[in-house]
Design a protein with these regions (language model features):
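Conserved, well-structured core domains of diverse proteins
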Residues: 1-176, 182
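Active-site pocket-lining/capping segments in soluble small-molecule metabolic enzymes
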Residues: 171, 176-197
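Glycine-rich phosphate/ribose-binding loops and adjacent secondary-structure elements
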Residues: 200-206
Length: 206
């Protein structure tokens, strides 16, 4: 194998990554130059080689093709959703700067931002459309005993930013065990957002 790798294999041989791909990783890790002047190692005329060609008259994009309407005639407020959106990531798992940036990006790009099961924070309200995710812990719409709170739900559901509500049926990352918010992470701000008592460990059922 050593002779094959160092003496006989070409730059484009080897699996799962060839020598050229491995070299790029090494160079980037060392912050070294990644470009080579003149010529190329690949054969652009070979069958299967793919490239992008410039067009003198580029086609105009029909952005309506990248949206889908959610809700039929029975829905009072159907939503025109982008096919590309921001997946569920809670405030607490991500910083306030990250959540604010993602939401502002959703506003600029006209797509939706999933809150994650951690509730709707102030940083989610930067003008982007929201998909409010409600998990097994009912964060943001629960009472002091952890039961579903109708009044809090109605209050959050009526926010103009909330376009859809997603019900998370189980803890997929920890099946059979449920989630856990440690007491040290349950700060007064997190507790306010999630309708919790601060500085106490909180379990989310599986």
């Amino acid at each position: 194998p050593e002779f094959r790798q160092y003496f006989f294999e070409g730059e484009l041989d080897g699996k799962p990554f060839n020598r050229r791909q491995r070299s790029i990783v090494y160079q980037r890790a060392k912050n070294e130059k990644q470009t080579i002047s003149f010529g190329m190692q690949d054969e652009p005329n070979r069958i299967g080689y793919e490239w992008a060609a410039h067009s003198i008259y580029p086609k105009k994009n029909d952005f309506s093709q990248f949206r889908v309407t959610i809700g039929n005639s029975q829905c009072s407020k159907p939503y025109s959703a982008s096919i590309f959106n921001i997946s569920a990531m809670s405030y607490g798992a991500l910083s306030k700067t990250a959540i604010s940036s993602l939401n502002e990006g959703a506003k600029m790009g006209n797509f939706a931002h999933n809150t994650g099961e951690g509730g709707i924070s102030d940083y989610h309200l930067k003008g982007g459309d929201l998909i409010w995710q409600i998990g097994t812990g009912y964060f943001g719409c629960r009472d002091g005993k952890g039961h579903f709170n109708d009044a809090l739900f109605v209050e959050k559901a009526n926010l103009k930013e909330v376009k859809m509500i997603e019900i998370k049926l189980s803890q997929g990352a920890k099946p059979g065990h449920g989630g856990l918010l440690p007491a040290e992470k349950n700060t007064p701000e997190i507790a306010r957002i999630r309708a919790l008592e601060p500085h106490k460990t909180v379990h989310s059922p599986s």
